[in-house]
Amino acid sequence: EICACLVGSEMCIRDRLYYPLCVLYFFIAFPLYARFAGGKGAAKKLFQHILKPAVTSLGTCSSIATIPANMEAAEEIGIPRDVSDIVLPLGATMHMDGSVFSAILKISFLFGFFGMPFDGIGTYVTALMIAIFSGIAMSGVAGGGFVGEMVIVSLFFPEQMGIAFPVIATIGALVDPPATCINASGDTVASMIVARFVEGKGWFQKKQAERAEKAGA
């Protein structure tokens, strides 16, 4: 495989943890966030309607292209329109937790590729800060990962730019789709959390009760 050929089996094993991490974050962290945001039943409601935004983001690699699907999901979940109208467009350009995951992977991969030790608190803190900064530098459009990759290479490996950028761009093509999925799907979860603080703790139950009353009328 690519990573085994370039940097050896140890680095390859570590990099393979990225995909399980994305899956665990999607199926464990998102329900916990939804539970916090809406209480009982919120996580179930989230997963009834999050599939379309997730698939759209995987197919387009664009958080902005996923906004219509996210708006539809937010409406079905019961998120107030005044919340989703603000949070979802902002989240498409600012909410980049998946991109931070992928940036850490890209940085550690390049360290292994160039034979540099990726260890020590200083290295970890620097990598995390650059990962966050590169996530902010990205836009929500398809291919926005190239901007973040350029930031990583220019800050960490400026003298090896000609070699490092093609390598990190290749890795990015493999890891950016799940990162975008977490970014975009997480925008709906973020809207639920904002709704809790704007509408109050029981907003989700009130919305479901209103819908049940209308359905029974």
Task: Please provide the spans of the model-predicted regions.
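Helix-loop junctions at the membrane interface of multi-pass solute transporters
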Residues: 4, 34-36, 69-79, 93, ...
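Transmembrane alpha-helical segments and their short flanking loops
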Residues: 7, 104-217
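Alpha-helical transmembrane segments of integral membrane proteins
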Residues: 10, 17, 48, 122-126
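Helix-loop-helix junctions within the multi-pass membrane cores of secondary transporters/permeases
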Residues: 52-135, 204, 208-209
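Hydrophobic, small-residue-rich transmembrane alpha-helices and their short perimembrane loops
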Residues: 28, 46-50, 54-66, 93, ...
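Acidic, glycine-rich loop-and-beta core segments that form the ion-binding/anion-interacting portion
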Residues: 14-76
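Alpha-helical transmembrane segments of multipass membrane proteins
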Residues: 21, 25-29, 98, 102, ...
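Single conserved hydrophobic/aromatic residue that forms the stacking wall/gate
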Residues: 1-13
